[in-house]
């Protein structure tokens, strides 16, 4: 079974060293409306753009690339 993007990002929460991806993981965790079951790039990127959770979509793109490498 494939992990959802949400599930993948949860492993980046509360790291020893904070970075952009760990900050995104915390924001996603705190957002009750985040599409937790989605594996779709366009659905998640559209949600993040509209929600204001993220300063730059390049952070999401980095996280998405890491997610794809582990799938």
Swiss-Prot record:
Pfam family, any one: YozE_SAM_like
Record-linked InterPro entries: UPF0346, YozE_SAM-like, YozE_SAM-like_sf
Family affiliation: Belongs to the UPF0346 family.
Name by which UniProt lists this protein: UPF0346 protein Bcer98_1690
Origin organism lineage: Bacteria, Bacillati, Bacillota, Bacilli, Bacillales
């Amino acid at each position: 079974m494939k992990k959802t993007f949400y599930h993948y990002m949860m492993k980046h929460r509360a790291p020893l060293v904070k970075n952009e991806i760990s900050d995104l993981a915390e924001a996603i965790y705190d957002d009750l409306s985040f599409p937790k079951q989605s594996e779709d790039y366009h659905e998640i990127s559209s949600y993040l753009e509209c929600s204001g959770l993220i300063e730059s979509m390049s952070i999401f793109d980095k996280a998405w690339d890491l997610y794809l490498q582990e799938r």
